Amino acid sequence: MASSINGRKPSEIFKAQALLYKHIYAFIDSMSLKWAVGMNIPNIIHNHGKPISLSNLVSILQVPSSKIGNVRRLMRYLAHNGFFEIITKEEESYALTVASELLVRGSDLCLAPMVECVLDPTLSGSYHELKKWIYEEDLTLFGVTLGSGFWDFLDKNPEYNTSFNDAMASDSKLINLALRDCDFVFDGLESIVDVGGGTGTTAKIICETFPKLKCIVFDRPQVVENLSGSNNLTYVGGDMFTSIPNADAVLLKYILHNWTDKDCLRILKKCKEAVTNDGKRGKVTIIDMVINEKKDENQVTQIKLLMDVNMACLNGKERNEEEWKKLFIEAGFQHYKISPLTGFLSLIEIYP
């Protein structure tokens, strides 16, 4: 009969140990991915036009001969995680997968800027101070580590601000892909304001698809001050907590998850004012996550819960349907509709 420790079988204990070690060393997942992007490996393989051999790869990378084995080990681990495919014929070679295709710079859909922004020590390094942050009454995690709120930090650090805007723009391109089958969102509209629209990545796609639709990108003055619009696209600087330009619809893409419930109510009330001006009854369209642990696949739930912890560090949150509903009612909206998008996002339309 197998022995037990504290009532646990050795097999249970070793399984638990494996789980612990997986999470203890999970930072290597992120850092090896950052290494591949920093070494431009996805582009090297893409430009090669076919699977690239280890010898060709290290020749292009110009690494010392003593590190060739380390390159192979990193590539093997990245392949195990789904970022490359190992082809074994005469010599071990590497091909892109769908995941690493999303890291090819210059492609229509490239998330390399997201990797660089999130895994910069400015952001990722802050998580070493979770214990200190949890005892602070009002400070965000970044307030603890950076000495100011995240948005204030961006204003004072133009280099990282550029990295952040590039990351958001790269993510917007994938959201735009999800919106391709959502023409109904824009049907019947004459105008829409993209609140927190950054450099206008999403707005430009909307304008191209609906050339008669007037689109306003509304963001902080320092974000939009040097940007040029077009016939149906304009940039307006301002503060969404003070006022939002009037339009038939307001778009909030990845905005509300950054803020507390109290701040979200302030934003939503300003949105309501913007879409009900002059007796009109427009709508507010939200693109964000809706947590549903009962119905979502485990991997989707994990992404949403990861993002929820990430947003908590900004004093924001990801929300389930009941939490969204409570916000909408308190902000004075009458009804809402949730449409799942491809991936882990949902499209929420709310009506005054």
Curated annotation (Swiss-Prot):
Q: Which Pfam families match?
A: Dimerisation (PF08100), Methyltransf_2 (PF00891)
Q: Where does S-adenosyl-L-methionine bind?
A: G196, D219, D239, M240, K253
Q: What is its EC number?
A: 2.1.1.150
Top EC class of this enzyme = transferase
Annotated binding of substrate, by residue: V118, L119, D120, P121, T122, L123, S124, G125, S126, Y127
UniProt subunit comment: Homodimer.
Q: What does this protein do?
A: Transfers a methyl group to 7-hydroxyls of the isoflavones daidzein, genistein and 6,7,4'-trihydroxyisoflavone. Can also methylate (+)6a-hydroxymaackiain with lower efficiency.
Q: What is this protein called?
A: Isoflavone-7-O-methyltransferase 9
User: What species was this sequence derived from?
Assistant: Medicago sativa (Alfalfa)
